[in-house]
């Protein structure tokens, strides 16, 4: 049974897309954080000093890419599950990622938050586009 509202938006697709986005961000983000922590500790940085080293662009840009990749995955999942209006479903997943991102990224630099907000919607839409059947693209 496909759960939809009167406009044809699949709630199931959106929920699964958001779960894929959040889950992907968490899994890859945690792995990235562990690798960074190990590298920093082996370079002699004390564990209590690690957080001060995490706000440099060299560290944060991969975080943006991880987030955009996870949102692309979420948009793809939403589009595939919905089987119609794939780009719209991907856009909704991306749009829902904006407030979720502020909950997680509130302590990051302003430039990071601006780029994150600007890129998350297109990433979700791109995932939805990739979910479209090839003959429809």
What is the meaning of each model-derived region?
Residues 2-137:
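Juxtamembrane/disordered regions of integral membrane proteins
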